[in-house]
Amino acid sequence: MARAAATQLVLVAMVAAMLLVATDAAISCGQVSSALSPCISYARGNGAKPPVACCSGVKRLAGAAQSTADKQAACRCLKSLATSIKGINMGKVSGVPGKCGVSVPFPISMSTDCNKVH
């Protein structure tokens, strides 16, 4: 009887741990917004190249987005942020990773299907 109770307790603990990991897995839009806020002026057409702080944020975000869930969450957040910023030039936005020396596993575009990002 005690053995069955101990087994159930272990199973409950494992399920709880998996749920905690799953909820923390994806990058938040707050993280994406914070990392990329230094890029807004450039994305609106100001400057010939992204500022150093912008590239630092892009690199930090690329390093944090390792799992498929992270990449898909970042993709969705990028699209949401792009629609909320007035005067944004998507041509400049799509070129930011390359200008910062960062490889991104999906095109930065409003037409990107974030569910297909891996």
Swiss-Prot record:
The keyword Zinc does not apply. Disulfide bonds join C29-C77, C39-C54, C55-C100, C75-C114. The keyword Transport applies. GO terms for biological process: lipid transport. Keywords: Disulfide bond, Lipid-binding, Signal, Transport. One of its GO terms (molecular function) is lipid binding. Pfam families: Tryp_alpha_amyl (PF00234). SMART domains: AAI. It comes from the Eukaryota. Residues 1-25 form the signal peptide. Plant non-specific lipid-transfer proteins transfer phospholipids as well as galactolipids across membranes. May play a role in wax or cutin deposition in the cell walls of expanding epidermal cells and certain secretory tissues. Belongs to the plant LTP family. PANTHER family: NON-SPECIFIC LIPID-TRANSFER PROTEIN 2-RELATED. This is Non-specific lipid-transfer protein 3. It comes from Hordeum vulgare.
